[in-house]
Amino acid sequence: MTTQLYLDIDGVLVMEPTPPYPPDFRALDVRVADGRFVPVAYSETIVTALAEVIAEHSVNITVASSWQSDAPYLFREIGLPEVEWLDLSGPAEVSMFERKHTAVRAHALQHRPQRILWIDDHLPKTQVECDPLATSLECADTFLLSPSLRECLTAEHLESIVDFVALSRAETPAGR
């Protein structure tokens, strides 16, 4: 079963390297990496755990982030494999999130994964607001996850991610 992860970077994996740090960024766990044009802070434990989940469940990753061509560099810096990134170029009057949605939808329609996991801190925060976005991806099994600003991924988010990617097709609830 193919699971496609569309992953934002800033606000999901990394943040500005200035306190206050999110609660899950334990003091001894915070690392600062060279983000090429700006230093970034990240939780080594969270990033390592995400990499393990991705590897264990053979999840395909595509970056959907304003970092675009700098994503592979940053991924190497924080210990993740280099992956494909979506071209989010477009007119200035079109918001970055609208460009992300258009690019994610086009990629999903081209590749037709059986399951989609989209993690972005700019996704809507409620299920009611996420439903139209999930439906627009034309995939029966989608999970949209939006970490809070300056929180990045947490241990609780990782549990939700594992729950989603570990489900077999028979266990998957309709209309997620």
Task: List the predicted regions and their residue ranges.
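C-terminal cap/substrate-recognition subdomain and adjoining C-terminal extension
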Residues: 72-176
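Intrinsically disordered/low-complexity terminal segments and short unstructured peptides
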Residues: 1-2, 61, 141, 171
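Alpha-helical substrate-recognition element adjacent to the catalytic core
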Residues: 2-94
